[in-house]
């Protein structure tokens, strides 16, 4: 578990663990939770590294595995853990730091839909440990708000990591087939706040050794039509926004990148 030398006794950090219904979409943006202190950028970057180490090292998973850097970085190997987190968002006051993120735990069978509800108490305990470690970094109270997502396609950060994680055992056609055959991802049954999902893979998966290195494959489900603010307001329609993320990792054939676009109605 990542540790930072303690400088003095700190106020007990807070931790909040939420479960989220699978009928909503969640982007990386949280209104009102932007960092208000530019001098905290360096600390925030250090905090991101610690959070990644907790997630990819298995500290937030039921099994402890070899620690590897994961999640936010776009140039590192994907760990064997099935715990994925979004990019955190930071809010600072003089006495407290609030960190908000989403997380998803994949099922043992690597299904796109996770139905496991076990060990939530263990996950909650590990997030509490994370709050304690981050409190030592910031030297103030840290409040971690961790919201569980039950489907990886609700957040682009999580979906890009999830697909890259499953790259060693799947082809791009497998990804496409999963989207087509999984009822929860059919274009007529997308969550109400999601109008479309696009997935693009650049490079070669280990299951596709005969294709060129520069191959780019993409698949789109749903619609990515975007209305201007004025037009949408006049017609009473939804204004769409794009939640975008990419994740780059390596296999024995070289580097490959998974890019994800999620079109959301707001």
UniProtKB/Swiss-Prot annotation:
It is found in: Mitochondrion. Its main location: mitochondrion. SUPFAM superfamilies: Ribosomal protein S3 C-terminal domain. Keywords: Mitochondrion, Ribonucleoprotein, Ribosomal protein. GO terms for cellular component: mitochondrion; ribonucleoprotein complex; ribosome. GO terms for biological process: translation. One of its GO terms (molecular function) is structural constituent of ribosome. Pfam families: VAR1. InterPro entries: Ribosomal_S3_C_sf (IPR036419), Ribosomal_uS3m_fun (IPR007980). Belongs to the universal ribosomal protein uS3 family. This is Small ribosomal subunit protein uS3m. It comes from Mycosarcoma maydis. The gene is MRPS3.
């Amino acid at each position: 578990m990542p540790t930072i030398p303690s400088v003095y006794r700190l106020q007990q950090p807070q931790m909040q663990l939420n479960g989220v219904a699978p009928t909503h979409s969640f982007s990386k943006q949280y209104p009102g939770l932007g960092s208000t202190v530019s001098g905290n950028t360096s600390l925030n970057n250090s905090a991101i590294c610690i959070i990644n180490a907790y997630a990819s090292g298995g500290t937030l998973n039921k099994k402890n595995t070899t620690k590897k850097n994961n999640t936010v970085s776009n140039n590192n190997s994907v760990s064997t853990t099935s715990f994925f987190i979004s990019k955190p968002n930071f809010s600072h006051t003089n006495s407290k730091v609030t960190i908000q993120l989403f997380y998803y735990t994949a099922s043992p069978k690597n299904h796109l839909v996770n139905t496991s509800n076990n060990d939530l108490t263990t996950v909650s305990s590990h997030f509490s440990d994370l709050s304690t470690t981050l409190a030592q970094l910031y030297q103030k109270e840290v409040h971690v708000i961790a919201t569980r997502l039950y489907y990886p396609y609700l957040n682009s950060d999580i979906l890009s990591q999830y697909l890259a994680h499953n790259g060693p055992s799947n082809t791009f056609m497998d990804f496409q087939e999963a989207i087509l055959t999984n009822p929860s991802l059919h274009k007529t049954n997308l969550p109400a706040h999601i109008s479309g999902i696009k997935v693009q893979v650049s490079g070669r998966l280990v299951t596709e050794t005969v294709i060129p290195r520069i191959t780019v494959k993409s698949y789109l489900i749903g619609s990515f039509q975007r209305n201007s603010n004025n037009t949408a307001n006049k017609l009473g329609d939804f204004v769409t926004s794009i939640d975008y993320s990419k994740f780059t990792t390596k296999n024995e054939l070289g580097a490959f990148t998974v890019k994800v676009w999620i079109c959301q109605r707001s």
